[in-house]
Amino acid sequence: AQSQDYRQAVRTQLIAGIANSYYTLLMLDQQLAISRQTEETWRETVASTRALMNAGMANESAVSQMEATYYQVQTSVLDLEEQINQVENSLALLLAETPRHYERGVLAEQQFPVGFSIGIPVQMLSCRPDVRSAERTLEAAFYGTNAARSAFYPSITLGGSAGWTNSAGSMIVNPGKFLASAVGSLTQPLFARGQVIAQYRIARAQQEEASLAFQQTLLNAGSEVNDALTAWQTSLSKSELLDKQVASLQTAARSTSLLMEHGNTTYLEVLTARQTLLNAQLSQTANRFSEIQSLINLYKALGGGQE
């Protein structure tokens, strides 16, 4: 049973690791696409700002600031490409394969069947290897306590019309003769009652210890499940707010660019609007990954679920 629990724990950890790497790739892919799109936008902005400078509507400082931001975005693109390569190598290691490019989906298109409005029954924690192990320890301690209690009494049964029977269930024809010949073995557990009581107390203490350990294991497991559920719920709440933030910032970025072209705003406002939009889009993508990651953590916290 312990080896089965170990295999289940390793299997769950491996599946969670593979899933985490896969969805990390999807997150990085989307962040890379956003950064490349932003890179192209900044390239056009640098060109238009330079044209404004040549027309006397912008200064060299504005062009330099725009170029610096453009180069910064290019650097971010290279960093993301490197991260993608590293995660692909990690995924190949988990799959025991030669590192390669993995065909994959798109983060925005990922759908998960979720419905935790009524919570998760605590019985589902029984799939966890550590909970199963603690449960078996408690069962063994419970049976040990009952065995110690049964030693209080001789192995003779009074069965009414069936008369006297021994531990094998055979009828004792002459109880008097049986008691006379077996008085030594019969009285031994009675006179050794103090020792039996001590054994019972030890077994009882072991049962209480196992019970406390089982309760603590359940509490720890439940805490992990609650943490995963809380993270999932938080990500869902943040998702709606981030969507609204990105939509507002997209409008602001377009407006400031148009205003600058007509000389009604400064390049600093354009820089701020564009940079804030990029950060919000990257955060939006990271939050979507956090939502998925919380479900992966929930899978782990539940011990991998049912086979």
Task: Give the positions of each predicted feature.
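Transmembrane beta-strands of outer-membrane beta-barrel pores
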Residues: A162-N166, L190
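Sec/SRP-type N-terminal targeting helices
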Residues: A1-R11, S61-Q65, C127, R132-R136, ...
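Acidic, low-complexity, intrinsically disordered peripheral segments
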Residues: P99, F112, S283-E307
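Alpha-helical heptad-repeat coiled-coil segments that mediate oligomerization/polymerization in large
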Residues: G56-N59, A221, A228, G263-Y267
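C-terminal structured "cap/appendage" subdomains that terminate the fold
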Residues: A252-N287
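Periplasmic alpha-helical coiled-coil/stalk elements that build and connect Gram-negative outer-membrane
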Residues: D5-I120, A231, S235, S255-L258, ...
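A short glycine-centered flexible hinge/capping loop motif at secondary-structure junctions
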Residues: M53-M57, M260-N264, A301-G305
